[in-house]
Amino acid sequence: MSPENDRVPTAIRPARPGAASSHEKLTPTARRASVAGFVGTIVEYYDFATYGLVAVILAPQFFGTENSAAAVLAALAVFGTAYVARPLGGMVFGHLGDRYGRRTILVTTIASMGFCSALIGVLPTLDQVGLVAPVLLILLRLGQGFAAGGELMGAVAYVLESTPNGRRGILTSITQMGATLGFSIAALVVGSVTAVTTSEQMSAWGWRVPFLLCLPLTLVCLALRLRLEDSPEFADMVANSEVKRAPLLDAVRQYPGAIVKAAAFTIATTAASHVGLVYMSVLLIKTLGFDSQSVYWTTALVVAVAALSTPVWGTISDRVGRRPVMIVATVGTAAVVYPVLWAMSSTSSIVVVGMAFLVYMIFTQAFAPGLTAVSELFPRRVRYSGSALGYNAGIVVGGAFAPYMSAQLVESTGSALSPALLIVAVCAIGLAAAISIRETGKAALRK
């Protein structure tokens, strides 16, 4: 029997000795881990969201002005290239994180992401250096993606391993809330720059400002992470000589089913969230004709409010389990996406657009406990490797090209409602994964 199937049923699995109850006070280690994970995911998704938000403005600077629709599609395709590099980054950093510790790798990933983003802010344009400009942009996006491949699931693993049983859902959801807030901050920054510049200034140099601001955000996160110790679970692994020489290979050989389920649920998670976080701004500005400044401000507000629901979903998952919340996320998102897109395309009121967008985003936040469950599927010796591999394999399909595919659907059908077909399809995949996954919410963290 494989290690993946050779497990004690959840209902009778004993808690590990000394495991804290859900009522035990959080330790300083757990609090520091949660804050560091939260700030790190803010930086990660600020970096990624900034590109998506300025894609419409950036497109002619790197891909020409002869065909504006083609330039936007090219810019969104470059957005997807960063995700293509994520699986390799997940494999490399996951392997290193299981061998040498979570903290060291999390410092490396956030530094790499931040510096790549800042360099985008100083790139020459197509008019200045010709085809070298889009090539450099693609290389930096690949660098971002490679580093990001080791970031989120490493942060989730670190927080899980520093948190008492019964509190893992709430604290890891706070880490994941940082992803949504990172996007909101990016929208706020882009909206602010748009407000104080003319359209000509924004096209000439204003788009660079949000990328350059990645640098101070990265330095703050580095200061926090450099003060951390490694997770108690990893320290215990070292003390008991449990660190494996090839954790990535062990994960693939011993837990293939868990990796596939992780990838399947991630397809739904990332496609649903990225259509909301990245493509909606393109749809509202380019297709539906809303003012860009209004869209950025509305997006920032809606996403910030929706982010507040993330810890609520995490708390619910600690009480009722991960699977019920995962099912609500997939079914709820699929159910509301068509009405939301219809409401957006049938009104000229940015307030109505914002309210519809908020409904959609609240349901997408319910996916957060699913990523916690993904990490909980693996024992600590391969947790970073296995979860990062599964997550990043899924994100290539779900996150990389969901905005691009949405734009193509609208372009080919002429209907602003057509991206709903994509979301319903990926949510069906996520629902199948949620139903098949074992419940981990109330079980002790696997050793």
Describe these PLM feature segments.
Residues 52, 256-305, 399-402:
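Extracytoplasmic gate region of multi-pass secondary transporters
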Residues 76-95, 114-116, 300-313:
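Central cavity-lining transmembrane alpha-helices of secondary-active solute carriers
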Residues 99-111, 319-330:
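Cytoplasmic membrane-interface "Motif A"-like loop-to-helix N-cap segments
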Residues 111-129, 331-346:
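C-terminal ends and interior cores of transmembrane alpha-helices
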Residues 170-194, 217, 390-402:
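Glycine-rich segments within core transmembrane alpha-helices of 12-TM secondary carriers
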Residues 221-228, 425-447:
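Multi-pass alpha-helical transporter architecture, strongest
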Residues 323-369:
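C-terminal transmembrane helical hairpin of 12-TM major facilitator-type secondary transporters
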Residues 381-412:
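A late C-terminal transmembrane helix in Major Facilitator Superfamily
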